[in-house]
Design a protein with these regions (language model features):
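C-terminal ends and interior cores of transmembrane alpha-helices
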Residues: 86-107
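Helix-loop-helix hairpin linking two adjacent transmembrane segments in secondary transporters
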Residues: 156-202
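Cytoplasmic helix-loop-helix junction between adjacent transmembrane helices
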Residues: 117-157
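Residue-level signature of mid-helix packing/kink "hotspots" within the transmembrane helices
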Residues: 30, 58-66, 160-161
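Hydrophobic core of transmembrane alpha-helices in multi-pass small-molecule transporters
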Residues: 91, 105-127
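Flexible cytoplasmic inter-helical loops of multi-pass small-molecule transporters
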Residues: 198-221
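Extracytoplasmic
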Residues: 13-47
Length: 221
């Protein structure tokens, strides 16, 4: 596709901001796998009790991805990413904070707290892929989306890789709660970038609209 330099530059800014935000959110999703042994040690929980935190969250994520699609279509990808990332940073922080809530004890009450908080995190996490795809659909012609899909996949793997690279030293040097606090802080930074840098389409930046030639354009020929 023959795009102007201004368009390419603005699209790259949009895409990189979304991509790094998505990676940051993945850090705030896979960090629990690093914290599991420390939760077990701190509270004396077995695998079944840890599973009681993870299983409801997986169910919530699967259902939310289905139900949040229409919401994303209605409010737009930019708002959806802001909602999802803000929720993820809040509930990652609250999960880490649970380690300091001694008044909840170490039994079923604390377990219920962690399970509830992680399920809320999963709900907001479900917005991320929906929002990213929605926004980029307005910036990429249908013939360019193969490249977009490849980069999208790389961002997913990047987020998974980062939490294990960054999270390992965190849990080695700091209390386990920081494996939730640090991703929360990174997501907070990216929310700011999304707010100021991301737009749903070229027309929102004062550029000419792009005919993406998919079903949304009304003419695929």
């Amino acid at each position: 596709m023959d795009h102007s330099p201004e368009f390419r530059k603005r699209r790259a800014r949009n895409w990189l901001t979304l991509g790094f935000t998505y990676s940051a959110m993945y850090m705030g999703r896979y960090n629990l796998s690093l914290a599991n042994p420390y939760l077990s040690k701190a509270f004396g929980w077995d695998k079944a009790q840890i599973g009681a935190i993870i299983s409801p969250a997986l169910l919530v994520y699967g259902l939310s991805a289905m139900f949040n699609g229409p919401i994303c279509d209605k409010i737009g990808g930019r708002k959806s990413m802001l909602i999802g990332a803000t929720g993820a940073l809040i509930f990652n922080f609250l999960f880490g904070l649970g380690g300091y809530m001694g008044f909840l004890g170490k039994g079923s009450l604390l377990l219920a707290y962690f399970a509830t908080i992680w399920s809320f995190n999963s709900y907001f996490q479900s917005y991320s892929a929906l929002a990213l795809i929605k926004v980029n659909a307005g910036w990429f012609h249908i013939s360019e989306r193969g490249i977009f899909s490849a980069v999208f996949g790389s961002m997913i793997q990047g987020g998974r890789f980062l939490i294990f690279v960054v999270g390992g030293p965190i849990v080695a040097m700091l209390p386990w709660q920081w494996v939730f606090f640090v991703p929360s802080a990174i997501i907070a930074v990216m929310v700011t970038f999304v707010y100021f840098s991301v737009q749903n389409g070229p027309e929102d930046c004062g550029l000419a609209p792009l005919d993406v030639q998919d079903a949304s354009s009304g003419d695929t020929e």
